[in-house]
Amino acid sequence: MNNGIMATVNQSLDQETAVLITTELGHVGNPIQENEAEEKMLEGFAQEGEQIARDAIISVLGHVDHGKTSLLDYIRNSSVADKEEGGITQSIGAYQVSIEDKNLTFIDTPGHAAFSKMRARGANSTDIVVLVVAADDGVQPQTVEAINHAKAAGVQIVVAINKIDKPEADVDKIKGDLAKEELVAEDWGGDIQMVPVSAQSGEGIPELLETIFLVAEIMDLKASFEGPATGVVLESGVKRGEGAVATLLIQQGSLNTSDFILVGDQTRKIRALKDFNDKPI
């Protein structure tokens, strides 16, 4: 109160105030970075168990109005996994698509901020970026920004040339524009898979998914399901009737009810686990 801060015994203080109070009480406070405890714990984790094949994690990026959301919606609505009663909750940060007993995990969060955090912490939560470019508009500033983020994170890129149903669509022009950004189509002698699609009619989307599965298979992605869980928080908040909730992407190990998780300098106990369809695990 003397410092102009009103707080109860159950509230947290900011670091500066906590250090000031500690000093006034005759002790020495040692400030730490927000993620320091988390990083030290991760350093102490050794990967346990056999590394086995895992699902690919996909982020869909692109310039505004190039059809990213429409493409995601079409894939969601056409997949076997999403035909269950009640559909899919639109606010979640991730969901799975199942096709012929094979799965893909899509991250539906703002891609740019996610990649910045990945670079800062030295971790990739995405394996493949699907870059959406409108066939009637071409490469735009956010397209270039998305390309740079993907390259900086060392992520595989698959291009979806969208809106091929439009009269003004020019697929070859798009390939030429992308070549200037050092993304050269495979049929132009490069190594980037580019698939013409229409998020409105669904044309080309089966081929796009097949291409993603092929790229993922070549990457030979693996993880262990044993030992403590490590991963990424995609989004978090407070939900009425449930309290604090978070969408997690587990990259190694297994997470169980009653486990404790550490995020930054905060710890919480897992009270319940649900899948992307909001069903208890």
Can you say where each PLM-predicted feature lies in the sequence?
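Charged, amphipathic alpha-helical linker segments immediately N-terminal to NTP-binding catalytic cores
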Residues: 3-38
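Pre-Walker A adenine-sensing motif
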Residues: 40-51
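P-loop/Walker A NTP-binding module and the surrounding RecA-like catalytic core of P-loop NTPases
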Residues: 9, 19, 29, 51-281
